[in-house]
Amino acid sequence: MTSHPVFIDLSLDEQVQELRKYFKKLGAEISSEKSNKGVEDDLHKIIGVCDVCFKDGEPSQIDGILNSIVSIMITIPLDRGENIVLAYCEKMTKAPNQPLGKVCLQSLWRLFNNLDTASPLRYHVYYHLVQVAKQCEQVLEVFTGVDQLKTQFANCPPSSEQMQKLYRLLHDVTKDTNMELSSKVMIELLGTYTADNACVAREDAMKCIVTALADPNTFLLDPLLALKPVRFLEGDLIHDLLSIFVSDKLPSYVQFYEDHKEFVNSQGLNHEQNMKKMRLLTFMQLAESNPEMTFDTLTKELQITEDEVEPFVIQVLKTKLVRARLDQANRKVHISSTMHRTFGAPQWEQLRDLLQAWKENLSSVRDGLTNVSSAQLELARTQKLIH
């Protein structure tokens, strides 16, 4: 979202006077005279009634009024501005419809970008900014990822408690429209807990697991098991279910669902979607150790009919998690490569061996090219002497 700098060609006193008169004219309970207590008291009074303009004003006119208020707010010293900023943010969450919500969103974004980057008030503004963005379906305009979020607060990082609160909000506003982003947010949230307080993160850990399992684009689930809050769930059904998605095959999930159908449904998980994901994960695991698989093997392991094998493999190839070739004539699937479901010590050793082999091959190629080059130079010198 773009934001224009705040600039009003009036003195603070003149702006305050005009704003008081404007809101008084709209019927707000506010005096048209300036406060003798100073501009901060004026702002408190103006912000207290500023939502009056939401009733009848045009969005463009309201935007100008809010811009004027913001231009005054950013002149208030940090130590005296917190209550004013918080009051304004609360008012911006009260927009009665989407068009005005977008105006309020723009105003908060303007305030956020005009505050000093080292100001702790930016956190509070951003939190309300996300709330308003949700109301007018503009979340991705203000939040595109965790890295972008950390960059915005680099000069004044919020406390762990503040970030936990913000991550929970971001999860809530993205879970219905961008499950992959929502899942990343929850993983980041769990990463804010330490060994000392991980035991209190039970609800967050469960949400994180459910979000990751439900996300059709999240397949590498092994890292979740290393998160401290998730470790505290060991022995719980949700942890057992996660472990199945991390390393077990389809039959294990089918058995779990038969034994705990009510639990799975209570978590908001869709059984058919779980089956679809477990089939893909099972295929990946089979591909790790089988360079080729028969259709018969796949029908048995994936619990599908032979007619469903080809469409299934095509869907797998679209994910780019596995590289393979269908051999319809011989009813086989030839595997070129696959992403590993888990990445532990064995996978690191395999990667090391592969890189070492590449290094040795490159050394051989280099030595060969050096020998060829030397031979050509020697031949050129010999021919020169002859002539």
Swiss-Prot record:
Tell me the function of this protein: Component of the eukaryotic translation initiation factor 3 (eIF-3) complex, which is involved in protein synthesis of a specialized repertoire of mRNAs and, together with other initiation factors, stimulates binding of mRNA and methionyl-tRNAi to the 40S ribosome. The eIF-3 complex specifically targets and initiates translation of a subset of mRNAs involved in cell proliferation.
Q: Which protein is depicted?
A: Eukaryotic translation initiation factor 3 subunit M
The answer to keyword Nucleus applying to this record is: no
Pfam families, A to Z = eIF3m_C_helix, PCI
Source superkingdom: Eukaryota
Concerning its family, UniProt says: Belongs to the eIF-3 subunit M family.
- Where is this chain's protein located in or outside the cell? Cytoplasm; Golgi apparatus
Asked whether the UniProt record includes Cytoplasm among its keywords, one would answer yes
Say where the protein is mainly found.
Answer: cytoplasm
Which organism's genome codes for this protein?
Answer: Drosophila pseudoobscura pseudoobscura
Its quaternary structure?
Answer: Component of the eukaryotic translation initiation factor 3 (eIF-3) complex. The eIF-3 complex interacts with pix.
Tell me which residues make up the PCI domain. 181-340
Listed GO cellular component terms?
eukaryotic 43S preinitiation complex; eukaryotic 48S preinitiation complex; eukaryotic translation initiation factor 3 complex, eIF3m; Golgi apparatus
Assigned keywords, A-Z: Cytoplasm, Golgi apparatus, Initiation factor, Protein biosynthesis
Example of a GO biological process term = formation of cytoplasmic translation initiation complex
Query: Which Gene Ontology molecular function entries are recorded, alphabetically?
Result: translation initiation factor activity
PANTHER family membership? COP9 SIGNALOSOME COMPLEX SUBUNIT 7/DENDRITIC CELL PROTEIN GA17, EUKARYOTIC TRANSLATION INITIATION FACTOR 3 SUBUNIT M
